[in-house]
Amino acid sequence: THKQFPNYKRYEIEYEGRPLVMETGKLAELCNSAVLVSYGETTVLVTCTASARPKDGVDYFPLSVDFNEKLYAVGRIPGSFNRREGRPSLNAVLASRLIDRPMRPLFPSDLRNDVIIACEVLSVDRDCSPEITAMIGASAAVSISDVPFNGPIAGIVLGWDGEKYLFNPTQEQRKTNRMITTIAATHKKIVMIESEADQVPDDVM
């Protein structure tokens, strides 16, 4: 592997009881950077591509985050007449925003180059969130690229079942949770909190 891919690197840690593996230097080498992230059985390929020159006539940062979750990732065939994938699902759109929201403020405010972060979900383990996997991969991909970025960030899902907190809860645990909160942070501060919950005490929140 090292002879065929001299830039290949692999890192593995345990993240809330499950293996988190990041690999780079093997896929999508024409992008500014690419990271293959696996969390449990969930695998996401995240690529970062930036234009060489600033975009003319814009007064904002043209960042685009695309989260693509195809049916093959869960072992299914599209049920439409022509067996083709449809438009991005609501979940995919929300996942794209979930990744965009904590990362966008960490780029320089005067950056005007087009930057596209593409998260391609290759396989899904329903107990290991593809959204969190993609968020970690997106942060890693931008961090190792030549795009200026004041990261990295990490994300975690925090659940509460009425008695105790659960970190990155499984799909079964989520069904009974009274609160599901997604948190993204740098090593210094929290940059995003998104929550859906029943009525819960203030001290729990």
Predicted regions and their residues:
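Short acidic, glycine/serine/threonine-rich loops at helix termini
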Residues: T24-G25, N32-A34, C48-A50, D56-D59, ...
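Glycine-rich, flexible beta-strand/loop modules in the N-terminal catalytic cores of phosphate-handling
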Residues: N32-I116, V121-S123, C128
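Short beta-strand elements
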Residues: I13, E23-K26, V35-Y39, V44-A52, ...
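Short, Gly/Pro- and small/polar-rich lid/capping loops
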Residues: T1-E29, A34-V35
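Stable alpha-helical structural segments in soluble proteins, enriched in small hydrophobic residues
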Residues: P102, T133-S145
